[in-house]
C-alpha cells in the first residue's frame, strides 16, 4: 500500500502516539529524559551470547539505572519484532523486511572442540577424513532456527551424532563429559581447560550477530540507551568473540 499526501502528513503524529503506547505498555512514559531511564526493555538473544557475554554486562547497566529493568530472552528461536516479542533482537541472520533499524553488532568465531581425555583415547585427528572415527554432538536438525548454525555438513558429514540438543549449553556440557566432538563458540569453550580445539585451522567458522529494533523504538530513551550499551559491549568484547 502507498500513503496518500494526507497520510504522510499524519505519519509523524501516529508514530509518536505508537511510541507513547509502547512506553506505557513497558511501564514507563515515552519521554524519560528528565526522570532518568525507567521501565522495561526486552532483549532477545541467542543462548550462549546472552548467558556468557550479555548477562554480566547488563548487570552494570541496571546498577547505573535502578528504575530500568531488562528482560533477557535467551531462547532457541527467532523472536519477532513485528509481534512485539522483544524491543531489541540480536540474531544470526540480518532482518530483510519490516520497518526495522539494523546494525552489525559483532562477529564471533566457532571451532571444533573435544574433551582432552576423549581425544587421548580415540584415534588422532590430523585431517578432516579422520573425523569419521569420532562421535559428534550437535543441534536437533528439524528444530534448528537458523541455517547459520549448520556446521557439520560443511566440515565432515558425521557417521554418528551421539547427542543432539537445541541448547548450546547442553552441547557444551556433553562435550565436557566426553560424549564427542562439537562446534562451539570460542567465547564459551576456549576458557575451559578440559577442552581442546580440533583441526584449529580447518574447523573454524565465523558468524555475525545482527542487532535490530522497530523503527518507532528510536523515540524511546530507554531503548536507545540499551541499544547504545549493547553496541559498546560488542565493540569491547571483540577480541574475546574472535580470538586468535
For each feature predicted by the language model, list its residue ranges.
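Short, well-ordered beta-strand segments
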Residues: 42-44, 89, 137, 182, ...
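A bilobed periplasmic-binding-protein/Venus flytrap-type ligand-binding module shared by bacterial periplasmic
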Residues: 209-221
Amino acid at each position: 500500500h502507498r500513503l496518500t499526501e494526507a497520510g504522510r502528513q499524519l505519519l509523524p503524529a501516529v508514530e509518536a502516539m505508537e511510541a507513547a503506547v509502547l512506553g506505557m505498555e513497558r511501564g514507563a512514559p515515552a519521554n524519560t529524559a528528565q526522570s532518568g531511564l525507567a521501565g522495561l526493555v526486552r532483549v532477545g538473544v541467542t543462548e550462549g551470547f546472552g548467558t556468557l557475554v550479555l548477562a554480566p554486562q547488563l548487570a552494570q547497566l541496571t546498577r547505573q539505572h535502578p528504575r530500568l529493568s531488562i528482560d533477557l530472552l535467551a531462547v532457541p528461536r527467532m523472536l519477532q519484532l513485528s509481534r512485539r516479542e522483544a524491543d531489541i533482537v540480536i540474531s544470526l541472520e540480518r532482518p530483510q523486511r519490516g520497518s526495522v533499524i539494523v546494525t552489525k553488532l559483532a562477529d564471533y568465531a566457532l571451532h571444533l572442540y573435544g574433551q582432552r581425555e576423549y581425544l587421548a583415547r580415540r584415534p588422532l585427528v590430523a585431517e578432516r577424513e579422520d573425523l569419521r572415527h569420532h562421535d559428534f554432538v550437535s543441534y536437533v536438525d528439524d528444530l534448528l532456527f537458523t541455517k547459520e548454525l549448520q556446521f557439520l555438513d560443511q566440515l565432515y558429514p558425521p557417521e554418528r551424532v551421539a547427542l543432539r540438543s537445541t541448547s548450546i549449553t547442553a552441547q557444551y556440557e556433553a562435550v565436557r563429559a566426553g560424549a564427542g566432538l562439537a562446534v562451539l563458540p570460542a567465547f564459551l569453550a576456549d576458557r575451559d581447560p578440559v577442552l581442546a580445539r580440533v583441526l584449529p585451522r580447518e574447523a573454524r567458522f565465523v558468524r555475525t550477530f545482527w542487532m535490530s529494533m522497530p523503527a518507532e523504538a528510536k523515540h524511546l530513551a530507554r531503548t536507545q540507551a540499551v541499544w547504545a550499551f549493547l553496541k559498546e559491549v560488542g565493540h569491547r568484547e571483540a577480541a574475546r568473540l574472535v580470538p586468535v
